Amino acid sequence: MKKLGKAVLFCLILAVLLAFLNRILMPDTTFQADTEKIGDEVDYMVVGTSNVFYCVNPTVIWNEAGYTGYDLSLEQAPLIITYYQLKAELKKVKPETVFLDCAAFEYNYGIASMNQLALDKMPLSMDKLRLIKALGEDDKDHHIAEENKYSKINYLLPLHKFHDRWKEIFGGTLKSRYHEKYENTFAGYVATKDHFVYQNPHKWLPTMEEFGASFETNITDLNREYFEKIQALCAEHDVELILIKTPSKGWLLETHKNMKQFAEEEGLEFLDMNEETVIEALAIDEQVDFCDSSSHFNIYGTEKISRYLAEWMQTHQDYADKRVQGTGTNAYWNFLYADYLAFKNAED
Amino acid sequence: MTLVSVSFLIFLAAAVLVYYLTPQKGQWIVLLLASLVFYWLCSKGFLIFLLLFAGIIYVFARSFETGKKKLLVLLEVAILIVLLIVLKYAGWFGDGFVRFLSTISFQKPLSFVAPLGISYVLLTGIGYSVDVFRGTVTAEKNFLKVLSFLSFFPAITQGPINRFSDLSGQLMEGHRFSYEALVFGIQRMLWGFVKKLVIAGRLNVVMLELTGSWQGSKYSGAYVVLTVAICSLNIFMDFSGCMDIVIGAAEIFGIRLPENFDHPYLARSMPEFWRKWHITLGEWLRDYVMFSFTMSAPAKKMNKSLKGKVGRKTAAALVSIIGVLFVWLVFGLWHGISGTFLLAAAYYALLIIGGIVIEEPVKRFRSKYPQFTESKGFQIFRTVRTYFLGIPGAYLMLMPQVKSGLQFLATIFTRPAAQFVVKITEGEGAGTFLLGLDIYDFTVLILSLILWLVVTTLHRKKDVRIRLSNIHIVPRWAILLAVVIAVVLFGFYGDLNAGSFIYQGY
Amino acid sequence: MREKVLAILKEVNEEIPEYEGEGLLEDGIIASLDVIEIVSALEDEFGIVIAARNITKENFATVDSICALVESLQ
């Protein structure tokens, strides 16, 4: 019995040490909105992939229309992750509308290293375990990447993946808080002044032939399954679900048509910003507005897109202009916008 | 699930818990179930083939009780070997066959691999059959007991190759929980993790760097000698580390498995090296191949007729050379039907036969100059010589192709001075790289090799675990915690390809 | 009989009579090569047949165990 007590004590000490290591070695890539400060008066939420955090700037929408909302997104997030992220989020806040990024339909199980970022942010719960299980399960079409299969333990014990970051401690390069890329974030929006010129000279909404590469443009069974879960989740929380596609020169006409038909079948509104009328209204300058690809925008591009979205909300939704009413979180939103302006106007 | 995964640790813990909660009479059933579950988790539907092998082995062993034993034994061995070849080289039989096997195993065609450990089951099973045939053990009447012996899960992935007479009784008798066995078993496993994850993981990176991932290397000359040494050290750390994990895991259940390594690098001759390296395979080959041949009627007849003509010594040498050739042919083929393994086997066979040929002159030399040949210096010379004779074999085993592998070796002579000094180059991105490792990993490799040397030297005189248990609890726990944390931090795992063993492929 | 066995063993390998351990075969004092010579000589001397099943580390552990083996086969 005494020996057993000693063994338990030994394991406890070990567990504490490991938990400590886990804490210092797990990279913190937080760029999600601070829901504590935003409060529960939220008009909208934009969920999905990097196309969300590189396109929609909630502070600009606030400044334009007085609507509150934020981005909830992850690089290359598959719908599975979006679903569980949204599920957790809707327990905390109740937006009027959820805009679902259609780029998420391009992924199935996502990429393990990216998924890891979302999972590391989730406290242990049954939903987290369900998500981990879902990410490791093969569907009948074998969309799963090998690395995902083997990542369950990484998702569960981040130290398993990040243990070799001990080198960064010795090298003095351990960044415990932000990924460099996520240094300037505003309500889930990642601001950057980077600049990228897209070389392929085709028009917006190209056909597959014009684009010069072939893709799977149909919605996979897996994504349909998780889309339906998202739909049910929104219905349960009495939230309107809208499909959105931010501008991207890689978004094909075929995919657009499929998605449009899908939205009609599901009886959902579908805002595709790649349509000719929208593109004209946005007046995107292809020489100036992209940051690292034709679907990711720097602050100049995102301002155009966000302003357009604010106008669209004014004509299509009946959110209240909170600047007029004056609620408790106005100060925070004004601060966020000022903060963004300071970043924008700062000399590099 | 490999032996170095977190899932294996969880599985092992669960099995140990159930094992000791079960009355001793039923413990072997728990082990059998654990083995089957382990096999299922690793290989899914290939469990069928394990059962098939066990079934064949069981039925034949029973049949030896009556009838024409010799023919039956040959038939059994032939069936098992054909089955093994069909499974290991499914690709030869066309895509359709691979797809069929994939359906059985519930695995995608791309990730097709031969059933886990089936080569070890084959050796263990043939050993058991021959023992029954020779009458040294009696055939087990209960199929489940044979299955439990053949499938014992710690040993099924890479051995050691068990003997029925040594293991079966231990499996059946049941064991009372012993705190010491638990602690010692865990400590032995921990040491295996150090060797496999911390040392071999890094040696593997160095090996791949030096050989250009076997695709064509930018190194030459003296680096080739280094490569050969690294290859052999890598196999040793990988394989003996695995054995530490396997034997440690078995120890927790109160079961002692045979050792597979006994300081092979201290061997003073090639035969001694093979008594210290992959011991159970060496003994298997000696007992079931070598003696089967040399004690057979034709071999004895040959010996007798030669004796009159060339003398007793030479006759025995000639017969044993033929035996040696058989042994190494089996050795090469067992590792795989490929030129590289046959070449490695031929290399070892040549060394052993060379030893037989020069045995008499060496003996005469030794009795003539006893002071010299028994001096410490000469003994050290023998060890060093054996080491350098032995290590190229490991390289031959690891190289994927005969031609490119030998071309690389040839650069020792063709481009001897091309790169002699260890050069520190700037790698892509950050940090300085040394032989494929950054400065941190390189430091860890050197420090862990020193640690290995110290622990091994201490262990030769007295079991390190007993030494540990004799010191005060504070330094003891500090050491143990430090080693666990070192494995957690410095281990090579967590990646897709990490954690696979060299000897799992054979 | 023991003297005869000892003489055979000594002729094959001088180290055998001096060996004090309990694993002639296991420790490699008797190599596979020696086994052939020993078996052949014992068979001739005592008119017995030694089979593969008899070549175990237990039977070839010490000079005494070899004598016992010969005795059991006579």
Each model region followed by its residue ranges:
Chain C
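Phosphopantetheine carrier-protein modules
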Residues: 10-29, 47-56
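Short-chain dehydrogenase/reductase
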Residues: 39
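Conserved catalytic core of two-component sensor histidine kinases
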Residues: 36
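Catalytic nucleophile serine of serine hydrolases
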Residues: 32
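Thiotemplate assembly-line natural product biosynthesis machinery
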Residues: 1-17, 68-74
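C-terminal structural segments of small proteins and small subunits
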Residues: 48-73
